[in-house]
Amino acid sequence: EFHQLLKLSVKAGEILFFLTDVPIRLKSGTKLIVDNLIFYSDGRYEFIDVKGALTPVFLLKKKQVEDAYPLKIKIAKKKGKRWSIY
């Protein structure tokens, strides 16, 4: 469903394009695959991972990646019929 929302945003011109299943590797060999890397028409970009439940493993890898690189991984969760991104 989030994928469909991204497609609609591309058609509306809000998003230029997006990549899915983007691997981010750490020197330790740890890898986190982020669901979406979104490139907006105003030049911004965001990493957004769609989650039902936040597992301890995901939270640990997210922290390791954010500590190692100058990026922030946002979380998308569906609440009712709306998406919440934080």
Predicted regions and their residues:
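Electrostatic, structured charged patches in enzyme active sites and in nucleic-acid/phosphate-binding
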Residues: 1-86
